[in-house]
Amino acid sequence: YAPHYYSINVDEINNYSMLVASCNNAAVENITIDLPKARDILDSLESSGDDEEEIRCGLDEVHDLFDINKSGDVETITRYGKSHEEKDIYFTRYADKLLGGADCWGLISAPFGRKANIRKYCNSVLKPFVEDYRSNDVREQHKAKYLEIRKKFLSQYKLVENLRKELGQICALAGSVPVELQEDAPEDLSCEISDVERKRQMLERQLFAEQKELIELEESRPKGLFARRKDTSARDIFIQEKKATISKLNGEITSLNNRISGLQNLQEYQRCISKYSHGQMKMTPVDAVFMERYVSEDDRLSTKAQITNPWFTAQYNREREKLFLYACKLHKEFVISSKCMRHNIINLMIAWNVFDDCGERMKLADREEAMPYMLQSIFLLTPVISTTFASAQTFLGDVKKSGVLGTLIVDEAGQAQPQMAVGAMFRCRKAIIVGDPKQIEPVVTAETDMIKQLLTAEILAGYKDKKISVQAFADYINPYGTYLGKDEEKEWVGCPLVVHRRCIDPMYTISNVLSYDGTMKQQTAAPKEDRARTFILDKSCWI
């Protein structure tokens, strides 16, 4: 094997690796099997007849970027002295081989977990990669491609950042306008601003006159200690009254200044919003109208608010999608042109005993020292990898350091006992916990149940509940959420996703009433008529 292992110079790159873990093997496998499929992405980018021409053009442009048949990126593959060309987006041929010819666009994710899955990944991806990019000449060619795509990526990144900042400024501008002013805005803002400015000027003239009189009163006071004693108290009373009047005028002027500022911000905000009101620039602002819909008891209006994406535009999304593709291509050229990446991959396969004819075996100390960096290389090649918690013990067993990987995504977290996620969380830098506490509870063995009964200390009382899960812990520390249920039975749920896109009636309505206190918003596509007819049988099959 290669005599050295290599780490990535810029450690921040490792922030973007993603490990998806769950108790449910099928759930996490489905995620990583679906992401590389071209059909799902292409379908989501299909324009409809109702779309404006500008929106259709934007969708069609991004659609073609993810269509392998329209890709202008061609790879020359040389094996056994013979060369052939293949169209590519992001290691497309490896993804196709890994997923059994599933018509993929790129190797964005892979299912691990079971040992058979890891071996299949090695045989379908790592071995061909090592063979295809063995030549120094090939790597040099890809270095030139790397520099070329880097320019495109940086240019696109600058464009996306400028759009983000512009949208952020509008968001901040909306926040600077008082809510009551948004709700009761004058019809003619320019006229209203002029009126308020005239009032301010009038008060400023009055203030100037009062200040002048005060100065004259102060200067007309008798000089000397004995002379001042003889002065009547009426003058002092008059001076105090002048000061009170001046203070009141200052307050009124400040109030008018604030109103002018608010009206000017509202005027600028409305000007910006009118710019973002059609085509690819159309945007949903979080304003008084949006909030009225959001909290409305009318299910149709509240659902409309829930399914919107505030402060985003179609143009911004399309440019972000192009940026994502350029980022994938940048990754690809970097990975191919790096000799260190190739060495790390070879060493990883030896550590995993992939080569049956390899007489060398990596020592435990070497494995534990090198494994964090070899896995980081794999995640650079395939950013999203899935595993079950049961298999994570084997997959990550040689990683003894914390924070080696980027983000841990726990799926079906309501089914996972808290201790199951500890090892994976230790090895990742942050975690996203996704689950539903109203669905299947964690499966607790008799031994675990017995241990929980021994937790007699008051501080440990919360850990005794059999239903406690990774999801419950995440919800407990999440300050954003809502309560489901009523009175003693209410349960805190963090960041609830209330829009439902899977079930149809009657299952949806029954579940929504029984488990979710009527908070869910249905957006499931209606089934085709021929399928709907077979959903409810004419008669019971139970009797």
Task: State where each predicted segment sits.
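Extended charged low-complexity segments that act as oligomerization/scaffolding linkers
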Residues: 2-221, 234, 238-241, 247-295, ...
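Secondary-structure-rich domain cores
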Residues: 1-33, 222, 368-434
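Accessory, charged alpha-helical segments in nucleic-acid-processing enzymes
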Residues: 47-56, 295, 299-300, 304-305, ...
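Conserved helicase motor core of SF1/SF2 NTP-dependent helicases
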Residues: 390-407, 414-543
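Conserved helicase NTPase catalytic core signature
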Residues: 241-404
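Short, flexible loop segments at the rims of nucleotide/cofactor-binding pockets, characterized by
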Residues: 199, 206, 362-365, 408-413
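Charged, low-complexity interaction regions
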Residues: 222-229
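Active-site-adjacent bridging/hinge elements
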Residues: 3, 214-222, 354-364, 534-539
